[in-house]
């Protein structure tokens, strides 16, 4: 049997005729019902608390703008944040390539999700002890770095569960449901945080009248985010069953830590030999997806430190950004089916680069609202079309492997945007210059995507 037959690919990335087609529902998704799909989506709803509250709009801004405001030395707090997240991304790059493989081979996918989720929640809860004092800046930075690494790694088994709660006929709808749950979960937790703890003026904020002294209101928001994530992460751990051990690749199941890298290298060489289009897309999407993540990671920090948006209004921008990104993703789905995912991604990335250049040239809160929201409109379409692109490339029965590599490559370069953001802030001694770092990542991803051939669109006879 040829290498193409063993891997399930022909040289065009299509189905190999001498390998039997795998029924995904029969192998992993047969028992999946509406309750399991909802439980799976609720994890995304809950995890949005880390992305929206901790990493993007509340705690990271508090850490750089308040806690680190009097930090001695010539390095900006936002540069330290970029480097800390860059280190976390590098750690993920070392461990993510083998984590999904080992989780599945040991039949501990759900257990791994539970452990990594719990570690993420623990770091979030400990952020309550980061007081408004520059001495606590390093403690907060360490918590944010570890939390980011745990959260990124938790996404590996979570994304792998998609095949357990879907079939090839509905994987797009189920995946889109999870994506929407994440966006709208972020909106809800931001609204609760803003109106309950942050809005208003004076020494006590929000409807709950929480004091702002020593950052109490923000520290309570971090604790709320931890409880939110914990509550909505539990259903998937009870509703979706653990996978039985697989015998599909005995070598992968028995491989140790370093042996797992040899297995990964073997699989990548085989894929490169028979389907370079898929490899090209995996590389390109990994790069531009890290740029998309950088938009949300550093957007709030730039809003406050560069464009003069009040701390209390950052959450309003975050809510608006999540709404327009969700609407953009829904709208782009229609164009994806009509013109193909590549055009959607290319147009979205070009539009984002143009909006980013405009942000480099303008100042003030109004201009940030205008061009910031214009930019985020195209984040959702690029994300959803990237998933659709790979779904069209993956041959029947190999979707799990493809999305495992999709996750792996994305995590492997997750240090690029934070590191370049930090580098440009440091090099030009200006927070605004960090925008250039994000734009560079988006532009490199776009350039890498352009030569990748559009996948064939196949209408399922379902």
Enumerate the predicted regions with their spans.
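Helix-to-loop junctions at the C-terminal end of transmembrane segments
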Residues: 94-108, 327-341, 425
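Short amphipathic helix-loop junctions that connect adjacent transmembrane helices
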Residues: 54-78, 297-313
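Intracellular juxtamembrane helix-capping segments at the cytosolic ends
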Residues: 153-166, 381-394
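Multi-pass alpha-helical transporter architecture, strongest
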Residues: 228-239, 436-462
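Structural signature of the two symmetry-related core transmembrane helices
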Residues: 111-126, 343-358
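A membrane-interface helix-boundary motif in multi-pass transporters
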Residues: 72-75, 195-227, 423-442
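Helix-loop junctions at membrane interfaces in 12-TM secondary transporters
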Residues: 128-142, 360-372
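Juxtamembrane intracellular "pre-TM" segments in multi-pass secondary transporters
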Residues: 19-38, 241-283
């Amino acid at each position: 049997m040829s290498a193409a037959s063993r891997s399930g690919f022909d040289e065009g990335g299509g189905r190999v005729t001498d390998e039997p087609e795998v029924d995904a529902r029969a192998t992993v998704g047969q028992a999946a019902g509406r309750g399991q799909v909802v439980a799976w989506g609720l994890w995304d709803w809950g995890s949005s608390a880390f992305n929206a509250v901790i990493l993007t709009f509340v705690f990271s801004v508090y850490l750089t703008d308040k806690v680190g405001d009097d930090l001695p030395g010539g390095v900006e707090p936002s540069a330290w944040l970029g480097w800390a997240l860059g280190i976390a991304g590098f750690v993920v790059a070392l461990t993510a390539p083998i984590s999904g493989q080992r989780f599945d081979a040991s039949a501990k996918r759900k257990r791994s999700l539970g452990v990594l989720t719990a570690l993420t929640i623990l770091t979030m809860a400990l952020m309550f002890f980061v007081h408004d004092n520059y001495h606590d800046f390093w403690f907060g930075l360490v918590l944010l770095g570890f939390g980011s690494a745990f959260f990124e790694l938790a996404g590996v088994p979570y994304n792998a569960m998609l095949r357990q709660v879907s079939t090839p006929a509905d994987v797009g709808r189920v995946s889109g449901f999870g994506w929407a749950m994440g966006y709208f979960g972020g909106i809800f937790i931001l609204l609760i945080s803003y109106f309950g703890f942050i809005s208003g003026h004076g020494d006590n904020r929000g409807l709950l009248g929480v004091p702002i002294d020593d950052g109490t209101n923000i520290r309570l928001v971090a604790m709320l985010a931890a409880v939110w994530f914990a509550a909505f992460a539990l259903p998937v751990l009870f509703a979706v069953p653990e996978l039985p051990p697989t015998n599909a690749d005995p070598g992968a199941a028995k491989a140790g830590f370093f042996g797992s890298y040899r297995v990964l290298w073997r699989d990548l060489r085989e894929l490169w030999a028979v389907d370079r289009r898929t490899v090209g897309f995996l590389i390109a999407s990994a790069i531009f997806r890290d740029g998309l993540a950088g938009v949300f990671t550093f957007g709030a920090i730039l809003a406050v430190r560069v464009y003069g948006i009040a701390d209390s209004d950052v959450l309003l921008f975050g809510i608006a950004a999540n709404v327009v990104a969700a609407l953009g993703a829904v709208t782009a789905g229609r164009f994806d089916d009509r013109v193909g995912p590549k055009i959607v991604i290319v147009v979205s990335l070009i539009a984002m680069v143009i909006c980013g250049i405009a942000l480099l040239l303008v100042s003030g809160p109004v201009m940030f609202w205008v061009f910031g929201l214009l930019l985020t409109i195209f984040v959702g379409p690029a994300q959803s079309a990237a998933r659709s692109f790979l779904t069209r490339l993956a041959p029947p029965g190999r979707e799990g492997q493809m999305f495992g590599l999709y996750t792996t490559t994305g995590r492997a370069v997750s240090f690029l945007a934070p590191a370049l953001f930090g580098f440009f802030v440091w090099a030009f001694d200006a927070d605004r210059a960090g925008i250039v770092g994000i734009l560079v990542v988006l532009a490199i991803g776009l350039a890498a995507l352009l030569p990748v051939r559009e996948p064939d669109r196949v209408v399922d006879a379902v």
